[in-house]
Amino acid sequence: MKYQQLENLECGWKWNYLVKKWKEGESITCHIDSSEADVAVQALLKLEHQPTGVLEWISDNMSPELDNKLKQAIRAKRKRHFNAEQVHTKKKSIDLDYRVWEKLSQRANELGCTLSDAIEYLVSEASRSEQASKTVTNLKEDLSKLLSDDK
């Protein structure tokens, strides 16, 4: 699925991605000389609010090894951004203990589905089981009434 590209927004994401990688200690520039790399990074840091400048910096200074990773990160961010606009595509998060997640993951693998589908399946099964239990209880009550009325 294609998502609309919003240049200013995505430039901000690119700037954040590059600064994050730099802070993590990764080499984000194509420069071998550390002084050139430092100058390029300082120039990048000054471009926070200049989207077109970020694109220019990327074409002039970014490490080629980082190009594919940056594109993937921006594609994922774009998808999350547009999916967050609609309730049915927005991702929700829940906290699970590791052992619970592990059991859920195993069940999802057995069913051959996603974790979300497995949760949905388990909830519907629990609902069906509860309904069947109520039906059995009602039948027992009706049967005991019939038997007690006969005497």
UniProtKB/Swiss-Prot annotation:
One of its GO terms (cellular component) is cytoplasm. Signal peptide: none annotated. It is found in: Cytoplasm. One of its GO terms (biological process) is regulation of DNA-templated transcription. Keywords: Cell cycle, Cell division, Cytoplasm, DNA-binding. NCBIfam families: PRK05097.1. Required for spatial organization of the terminus region of the chromosome (Ter macrodomain) during the cell cycle. Prevents early segregation of duplicated Ter macrodomains during cell division. Binds specifically to matS, which is a 13 bp signature motif repeated within the Ter macrodomain. Belongs to the MatP family. Homodimer. This is Macrodomain Ter protein.
